[in-house]
């Protein structure tokens, strides 16, 4: 494209102008000394250079043809190298902007039931940041060039700054969008998500250039008055406020609900008043998307709460998808993959894509892939450091610490374990029994003694006698305690207690509990607790049913689940119904209920498990006695007494025969979601923390790999030849700009301030080089600005938009910001420069004069072509195309050719008017 424009400009320079002036030759330069001279009436470029803001004139000022060619090459190469420098410092500048706009605040959300949760949301509104700092970052060279040109030339209006702003707007509107349309893979399309915001920014973009024409050619032709300049500057915050109101659905949006649809015949978007919308395209919600209330969100509430809930849902969906792809990995292993996946697929800012494009072009590597590799390297030593350190001491404890026995068992055996240590010492540890509800002498035999662990021994057993009786009684328990550890050498001789590291110690559990179960009763059946909290990620929950106060005979115990707020049948849990059979002397059984894991961030549903009446099986004489009723034979007194005792011993339900199970969100899953939300802040990816990190990045060459893997598992490839070439071409700028303060300092503002000063310095050099290049080859500043300077400042944005179009699921980041930045360029770039100059000349009592013809013609031409471009983009939202970007091959190629053609026509007509081949205003 650039070569075509250069050929066109060369032909224009060779053709005779409409005014009939003689064509200049190298040996006889034209009389005007600078463009300000020719701007009043001349149609040819000047061959006589004037001092710039920073660069002096290259003497002698009347060189030969060969010297002119050499100078032109030097100026052009220097200008290109300066553009590379601006791109790299803009990388730092945009990183600072990303850190500033990514600043978060904590919010407390109160739900309907009174519970509160704390989360973090961004302070900066996305639309406001895109139109202010983001637009300033991407358009800083154009804006600063306009300001520096006016201030550096005695507050005289120039052609380079305004021409660059209009030319850059044309390049962004036509070439950048054409590239974005073409690079979308076949069969795919991208739509603008925030269409209301796009309408507002597009309208302001058109209005900005219409307003520019009005103040140049209608209100006060050839003069910019103070009120016109100041009003141009004031339009910038007004534009931001209108875009913010559209994004927040203020004004009439809050009073009227509209349902939008596309007419199948005409493709026109139709709105109708009605119920609250479930899916509105203008809201940025794709057709078929679930409403917030349907997603278990917070419903109506603050925008911050809905934003936080949406972030959580995105992370949860990512974890669900990764679990299906990698069922063999646990949650901790998925965190790293999920972090990379979330960073890769989340909607990114204009700053990120600008930084990504610059680093890929300059051999600095893929931002996300380098971040994932650095995170993996940091995690490896952290995992090793997390392992428990052994102090070398032996640990002595009960294993297990809970024991159950029937009262007719005679004795119970307890186990004591010696674990760890060097194994070359002898340990003496005392034990003794302690009463609980069971009493020594009546329920068990009191015991005390000493256990001796010789070198190499790891386990000892001690036996406690149990006393049996024929009295029906509740279950009872007593304790056995370990105490008084002494250490001996290998021969068993006691060692003095030194002040160094101990060779052994008693650790929990030091106390063993022994429960004596009565064997004179069939048992009381119940759950251990009335309430059981389970995590939804458990899969299957094991519920224990205990048999206390006896364990005689075989008992069958029915059970079933009952719905509460949780629903069975596979919704929240699987229904369970059956029977547990307790054998003789069996005191515990486990039933299982399967929990469905739907991975919700917050959850609290309940259901119940109920026990039925126990049935006594294989009861022997007791069965006969209990089954005998008022038959033909009356029971004897002995049989009546036996029946009464048997009736007392039959199985019954205990107090806890109904268990409430509360299904809650997984604590680990919730922590993982919160951790990922914090990690997916792009400011952590592109920001820097120290000068050391910046200098290491500056001297390191990495592979410029644009293709992303969803799990980041592909091995990092070696840099290509292009990566090495670009790295060595730009290593001077990289090392120089590594001196800029890291983005972590002062929350990014230190980097912001230093970067914009450096960009201003380089922009002043670019302006001088462009002017000297133009006067050397006889190219007017207006044409030079539209072709070369606008192209140089917009190349990084082109690559950034291309990456955004390929990686984002919507078109906002790639083309949605084009219209906003075009408006900001006029309101800030020309508003600031012209306000300063108009006020200066008003104080001097003179008007601020601006040449009307070329600039007014370019503005009008761009406005007409922009109307055509925006209309085509809106037409492409018809169903058969699918969106502003991509679509079927035929419409895609046709639209790309149309936009490129509009840009070439703009260059052609602007150049023809500048050289008087056609009449302007």
UniProtKB/Swiss-Prot annotation:
Residues 21-68, 153-164, 220-222, 741-747, 792-822, 876-892 are extracellular. SMART domains: Calx_beta. Residues 91-130, 186-196, 247-720, 771-772, 844-854, 910-921 are cytoplasmic. Calcium transport is down-regulated by Na(+) and stimulated by Ca(2+). Ca(2+) 1 binds at residues 407, 443, 469, 473. Gene3D superfamilies: 2.60.40.2030, NCX, central ion-binding region (1.20.1420.30). It is a multi-pass membrane protein. It comes from the Eukaryota. Alpha- repeats lie at residues 135-175, 790-826. The chain crosses the membrane at residues 69-90, 131-152, 165-185, 197-219, 223-246, 721-740, 748-770, 773-791, 823-843, 855-875, 893-909. Residues 384-483, 512-612 form the Calx-beta domain. Ca(2+) 6 binds at residues 598-600. SUPFAM superfamilies: CalX-like (SSF141072). Ca(2+) 5 binds at residues 536, 598, 600, 665. Coiled coil: none annotated. One of its GO terms (cellular component) is postsynapse. Glycans are attached at residues 34, 817. Ca(2+) 2 binds at residues 407, 468-469, 519-520. Residues 22-42 are annotated as: Disordered. Ca(2+) 4 binds at residues 443, 469, 473, 476. InterPro entries: CaCA, CalX-like_sf, Calx_beta, Na_Ca_Ex, Na_Ca_Ex_C-exten, NaCa_Exmemb, NCX_ion-bd_dom_sf. Belongs to the Ca(2+):cation antiporter (CaCA) (TC 2.A.19) family. SLC8 subfamily. This is Sodium/calcium exchanger 2. The gene is SLC8A2.
């Amino acid at each position: 494209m650039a070569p075509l424009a250069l050929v066109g400009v060369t032909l224009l320079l060779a053709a005779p102008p409409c005014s009939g002036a003689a064509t200049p030759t190298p040996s006889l330069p034209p009389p005007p000394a600078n463009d300000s001279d020719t701007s009043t009436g001349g149609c040819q470029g000047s061959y006589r250079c004037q001092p710039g803001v920073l660069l002096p004139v290259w003497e002698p000022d009347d060189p030969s043809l060969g010297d002119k060619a050499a100078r032109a090459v030097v100026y052009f190469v220097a200008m290109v190298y300066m553009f590379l420098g601006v791109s790299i410092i803009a990388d730092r500048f945009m990183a600072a902007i990303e850190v500033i706009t990514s600043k978060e605040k904590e919010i407390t959300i109160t739900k309907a039931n009174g519970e509160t949760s704390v989360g973090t949301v961004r302070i900066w509104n996305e639309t406001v940041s895109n139109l202010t700092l983001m637009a300033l970052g991407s358009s800083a060279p154009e804006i600063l060039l306009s300001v520096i040109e006016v201030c550096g030339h005695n507050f005289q209006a120039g052609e380079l700054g305004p021409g660059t702003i209009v030319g850059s707007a044309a390049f962004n509107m036509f070439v950048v969008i054409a590239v974005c349309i073409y690079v979308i893979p076949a069969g795919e399309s991208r739509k603008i998500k925030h269409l209301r915001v796009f309408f507002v920014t597009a309208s302001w973009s058109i209005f900005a250039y219409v307003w520019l024409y009005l103040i140049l050619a209608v209100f006060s032709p050839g003069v910019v008055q103070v009120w016109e300049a100041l009003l141009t500057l004031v339009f910038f915050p007004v534009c931001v406020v209108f875009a913010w109101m559209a994004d927040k659905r203020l004004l009439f949006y809050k009073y009227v609900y509209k349902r939008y649809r596309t007419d199948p015949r005409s493709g026109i978007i139709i709105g109708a008043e009605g119920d609250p919308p479930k899916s509105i395209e203008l809201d940025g919600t794709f057709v078929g998307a679930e409403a917030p209330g349907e997603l278990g969100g917070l419903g109506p509430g603050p925008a911050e709460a809905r934003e936080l809930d949406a972030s959580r849902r995105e992370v949860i969906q990512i974890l669900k998808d990764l679990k299906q792809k990698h069922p063999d990995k646990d949650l901790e292993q998925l965190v790293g993959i999920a972090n990379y996946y979330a960073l890769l697929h989340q909607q990114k800012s204009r700053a990120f894509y600008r930084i990504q494009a610059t680093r890929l072009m300059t051999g600095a590597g893929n931002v996300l892939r380098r971040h994932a590799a650095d995170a993996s390297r940091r995690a490896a030593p952290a995992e090793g450091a997390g392992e428990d350190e052994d102090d070398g001491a032996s640990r002595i404890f009960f294993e297990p610490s809970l024991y159950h026995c029937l009262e007719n068992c005679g004795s119970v055996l307890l186990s004591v374990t010696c674990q760890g240590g060097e194994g070359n010492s002898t340990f003496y540890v005392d034990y003794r029994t302690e009463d609980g509800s069971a009493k020594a002498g009546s329920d068990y035999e009191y015991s005390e003694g000493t256990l001796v662990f010789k070198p190499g021994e790891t386990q000892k057993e001690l036996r406690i006698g149990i006393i049996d009786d024929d009295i029906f009684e509740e279950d009872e328990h007593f304790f056995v305690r370990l105490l008084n550890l002494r250490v001996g050498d290998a021969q068993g001789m006691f060692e003095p207690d030194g002040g160094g590291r101990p060779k052994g110690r008693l650790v929990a559990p030091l106390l063993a509990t022994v429960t004596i179960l009565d064997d004179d009763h069939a048992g009381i059946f119940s759950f251990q607790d009335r309430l059981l909290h389970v995590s939804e990620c458990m899969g299957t929950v094991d519920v224990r049913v205990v048999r206390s106060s006896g364990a005689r005979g075989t008992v069958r115990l029915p059970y079933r689940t009952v719905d509460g707020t949780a629903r069975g049948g596979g919704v929240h849990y699987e229904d369970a119904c059956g029977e547990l059979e307790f054998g003789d002397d069996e005191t515990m059984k486990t039933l299982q209920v399967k929990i469905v894991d739907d991975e919700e961030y917050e959850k609290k549903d309940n259901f119940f498990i109920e026990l039925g009446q126990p049935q006594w099986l294989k009861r022997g004489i007791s069965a006969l006695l209990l089954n005998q009723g008022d038959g033909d034979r009356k029971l004897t007194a002995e049989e009546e007494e036996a029946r009464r005792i048997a009736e007392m011993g039959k199985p019954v339900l205990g107090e806890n025969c109904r268990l409430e199970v509360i299904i809650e969100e997984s604590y680990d899953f919730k922590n993982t979601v919160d951790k990922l939300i914090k990690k997916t802040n792009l400011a952590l990816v592109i920001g820097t923390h120290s000068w050391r990190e910046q200098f290491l990045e500056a001297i390191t060459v990495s592979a410029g790999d644009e293709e992303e893997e969803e799990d980041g598992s592909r091995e990092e490839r070696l840099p290509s030849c292009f990566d090495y070439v670009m790295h060595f071409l730009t290593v001077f700028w990289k090392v120089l700009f590594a001196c800029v303060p890291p983005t972590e300092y002062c929350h990014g503002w230190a980097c912001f301030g230093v970067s914009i000063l450096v960009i201003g310095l380089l922009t002043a050099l670019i302006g001088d080089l462009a002017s000297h290049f133009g006067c050397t080859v006889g190219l007017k500043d207006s044409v030079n600005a539209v072709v070369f300077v606008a192209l140089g400042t917009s190349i990084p944005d082109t690559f950034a938009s291309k990456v955004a179009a390929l990686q984002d699921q919507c078109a906002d980041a790639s083309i949605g910001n084009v219209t906003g930045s075009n408006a900001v360029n006029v309101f800030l770039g020309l508003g600031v420069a012209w306000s300063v100059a108009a006020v200066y000349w008003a104080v001097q009592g003179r008007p601020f004069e601006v040449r009307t013809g070329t600039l007014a013609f370019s503005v009008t031409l761009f406005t007409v072509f922009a109307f055509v471009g925006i209309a085509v983009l809106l037409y492409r939202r018809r169903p058969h195309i699918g969106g502003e970007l991509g679509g079927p091959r035929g419409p895609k190629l046709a639209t790309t050719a149309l936009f490129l053609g509009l840009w070439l026509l703009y260059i052609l007509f602007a150049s023809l008017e500048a050289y008087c081949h056609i009449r302007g205003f």
